[in-house]
Curated annotation (Swiss-Prot):
A Pfam short name: DUF2616
Protein name per its UniProtKB record: Uncharacterized 14.9 kDa protein in LEF8-FP intergenic region
InterPro entries: AcMNPV_Orf52
Length: 123
């Protein structure tokens, strides 16, 4: 059985793969190459259709705490984190945004748990 949002996980994988390098990169040309690689990893027709009404609107990035202009990938242009802010002042997150929120909270939880485990092993 295929879960209807299974394609959305590629954005999460791409975020984990490219985000740290993208954020810390100071070379403009290399940063463009990273963005192109990231784009190839995440883009699909479903995302293009979903993001069209929100493109060029402002949103708040929960990760880097910046107000950003929404791009066609529904992600922050500063850190590549998916936009999970209310779009167009609507009172609900889209199903894709709800999935992103759940998964990223899970990633943060497990990452922190692993770091705590490492810290206790060192002591």
């Amino acid at each position: 059985m295929t879960w209807p949002y299974s394609n959305s996980f590629k954005l999460i994988k791409a975020y984990q793969k490219h985000s740290n390098t993208y954020q810390s990169c100071t070379n403009h040309k290399y940063k463009s190459v990273l963005l192109k690689k990231w784009t190839q990893d995440v883009m699909d027709n479903e995302l293009r259709i979903e993001s069209r009404p929100y493109k060029n609107c402002d949103a708040f990035c929960q990760m880097c705490l910046s107000v950003v202009t929404i791009n066609e990938y529904l992600c922050c242009d500063k850190c590549l984190f998916p936009i999970i802010d209310y779009l167009e002042k609507q009172r609900q997150l889209t199903p894709r945004q709800q999935l992103y929120m759940f998964v990223f909270l899970s990633i943060c939880y497990w990452k922190e748990a692993a770091e705590r485990r490492l810290a206790t092993m060192k002591n």
